[in-house]
């Protein structure tokens, strides 16, 4: 309980330092009206918007609880953005979700004649701009959309926003690692007190950059 406000202080899922080290809170210079409520402040040195870590943490809890209500194979997780490919693949591996990485083929959710056609009950997207096709199709067939949204994202047709830096590879690794853990916790498949290397270390969720 906070002595100043009388509000109950909820402990973060992971240490604050871990969020900060992975840059999950670092937004962009642009802030859309949709994302203003998640911004903590602007950084004086460069004008970047800083997301409120407590709101990120709280939305991860809410999203994990929501996703855990669906059959694993009925969850589709999407990332056109390259830095989201490995995190999405790992999330799918441990949760049983259907991963779609790279180009999202138009009609994936709406055209049964396509080989890639799939019928999820919910989709999780990495970036509302990059994954717009998936969001449009989800809205067309009437299924909920959970989205990781940076400060510059628009959120039309998004049912549940997870604020966070969706451009950095370390940030996306941590966000998907934490979502994975929380979904498993909500399903009763992982203890809330499980070590940080379960179900796998966060480093294994990170897209590796090939040196040329």
Curated annotation (Swiss-Prot):
What UniProt keywords apply to this chain's record, in alphabetical order?
A: Ribonucleoprotein, Ribosomal protein
CDD domains, per the entry: RPS2
Q: Which gene encodes it?
A: rps2
Q: What name does this protein carry?
A: Small ribosomal subunit protein uS2
Tell me the SUPFAM superfamilies matching this sequence. Ribosomal protein S2
Q: Which GO terms describe its molecular function?
A: structural constituent of ribosome
User: Which terms does the UniProt entry file under GO BP?
Assistant: translation
What segment(s) does the record annotate as region Disordered? 190-212
Superkingdom of origin: Archaea
Q: Which Pfam families match?
A: Ribosomal_S2 (PF00318)
Matching entries from PROSITE patterns are given as:
RIBOSOMAL_S2_2
Entry similarity comment: Belongs to the universal ribosomal protein uS2 family.
